[in-house]
A protein has these predicted regions:
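Predominantly late transmembrane helices and immediately cytosolic-facing juxtamembrane segments
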Residues: 2-21, 38-41, 178, 206, ...
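Alpha-helical transmembrane segments of multi-pass membrane proteins
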Residues: 32-48
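Hydrophobic transmembrane alpha-helices of secondary-active transporters
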Residues: 64-94, 243-245, 268-288, 307-314, ...
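Interfacial helix-loop-helix linkers and transmembrane-helix boundary segments
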Residues: 69, 89-104, 129-131, 157-159, ...
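Structural signature of hydrophobic alpha-helical transmembrane segments
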Residues: 69-80, 129-143, 184-197, 233-241, ...
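Entry/N-cap segments of selected transmembrane alpha helices
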Residues: 90-118, 188-200, 285-311, 334-338, ...
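Transmembrane alpha-helices that form the ion-translocation and gating core
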Residues: 107-146, 302-358, 379-390
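Functional cores that coordinate and move charged inorganic groups
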Residues: 149, 153-246
Length: 393
């Protein structure tokens, strides 16, 4: 190879290695978020908005009458299906299998969701029109957070990375429960009963030892359709369907769950989540920033993510060690724990998702909330990276 081409070739190989690694999904999300912000504040912002929100003249499912609806209620159900697969694997035979291993991540996730919610309610003064958004700063974007950790490489102890992953997994489970309990209204009992029967059938197939991936995929699709029409958010269908997929190895030494997770995880990380980011992260920055009452919502979310999440996760680790309930990750300093706690404040995907559910009736509140999500996530990511970078020297 000619010498002049070597730098380009080396750069290309480095880029491929990066994109294949854990940092790739996080970096892709950063690029997508920036692209969405640029487009939302460009001369093409109107066209960009219409692309996702224009009512479709023809759609096979009446409830999904726009590209935005297909992404948020359709593609994101598949994202939650992958989340469900991961949760089941981790609980049955992964890092959350042993009770002792669950203690610290569960406590950290619990306080990491409760404290941001309290910060949000305190800043908004529990205003009735804003109260439904209390769960927005309670979420963690695992792709972003792990991407930042991966950028630091071996300078961060493996125990810290594992701690972040397990906290984020428990956090995802908590977010799913919140969506099911808080952001569900107008239940259609007939469709809900149909969803229950489909779920029972899928569970029965698991108990009978049926290990055919296509059967569970078909069942998941039917369950999603029923839940979509029941009034419960269809993301719940993704998680419930995943929990029926068998993890045990069959006679050929294969696992339906592991095979599905291996196939769908890259699709979720490199296609579904970026598409969701493009459709939801774009927010027009106003000429005059919000002030007074209008500032309360974005400020509450940003402080919930940056201050509340950091304080909740770090406080949980400190309390667990102080009361000998659990020990902090092996080989990690308190400053490193603080850095990882800050990274848990990167809400992005899940926070934007909950924003759409919380303020679906008020487009202006959605836009205000997006400012808080993006600002808080950015500050949390920068603080976490800076703290971990400093301790890694």
């Amino acid at each position: 190879m000619p010498a002049r081409n070597r730098p380009i070739s080396n750069l290309a190989r480095a880029a491929v290695r990066l994109l294949r690694g854990e940092a790739g999904a996080g970096l892709l999300l950063i690029g997508v978020a920036l692209a969405a912000m640029v487009l939302a504040n460009s001369p093409w912002s109107g066209l960009w908005h219409d692309l996702f929100h224009h009512q479709l003249a023809a759609t096979p499912i009446a409830r999904l009458d726009s590209l935005h609806a297909w992404i948020n209620d359709g593609l994101m159900a598949l994202f939650f299906f992958v989340v469900g697969l991961e949760i089941k694997r981790e609980v049955l035979e992964g890092d959350l299998a042993a009770p002792a291993q669950r203690r610290l991540p569960v406590l950290a996730a619990a306080l990491g969701m409760a404290v941001p919610a309290l910060v949000y309610l305190a800043v908004t003064n529990a205003a009735p029109q804003l109260a439904r958004g209390w769960a927005i700063p309670a979420a963690t974007d695992i792709a972003f957070a792990v991407g930042v950790i991966a950028l630091l490489g071996r300078r961060v102890p493996p125990s810290l990375r594992l701690f972040l992953l397990t906290v984020a997994i428990v956090d995802d489970l908590g977010a799913v429960v919140i969506i099911a309990l808080v952001y569900t209204a107008g239940i259609d009992l007939v469709w809900l009963a149909a969803a229950g029967m489909i779920l029972a059938a899928m569970t029965g197939l698991n108990l009978l030892g049926v290990a055919r991936g296509w059967i569970y995929a078909l069942g998941a699709g039917l369950l999603w359709f029923a839940v979509l029409h029941s009034g419960v958010h269809p993301s719940i269908a993704g998680v419930l369907a995943a929990l029926t997929v068998p993890l045990a190895l069959d006679r050929a030494g294969d696992s339906v769950l592991l095979r599905m997770e291996h196939t769908l995880t890259p699709i979720s990380a490199y296609a579904i989540v970026p598409i969701f980011g493009l459709a939801n992260a774009g927010v027009a920055i106003p000429a005059a920033m919000p002030n007074g009452a209008a500032l309360a919502l974005p400020l509450a979310i940003a402080l919930g993510l940056l201050v509340g999440k950091t304080a909740g996760v770090f406080g949980a680790v400190w309390l667990a060690e102080a009361f000998k309930f659990a020990e902090r990750p092996a080989g990690a300093s308190w400053l490193q724990v603080l850095g990882v706690a800050a990274l848990c404040g990167i809400g992005f995907t899940m926070s934007l998702f909950i924003t759409q559910l919380a303020f679906s009736a008020s487009p202006q509140l959605v836009e205000d909330a997006k400012l808080g999500v993006l600002g808080g996530s950015l500050l949390a990511g920068l603080c976490g990276y800076a703290l971990l970078r400093r301790t890694a020297r």
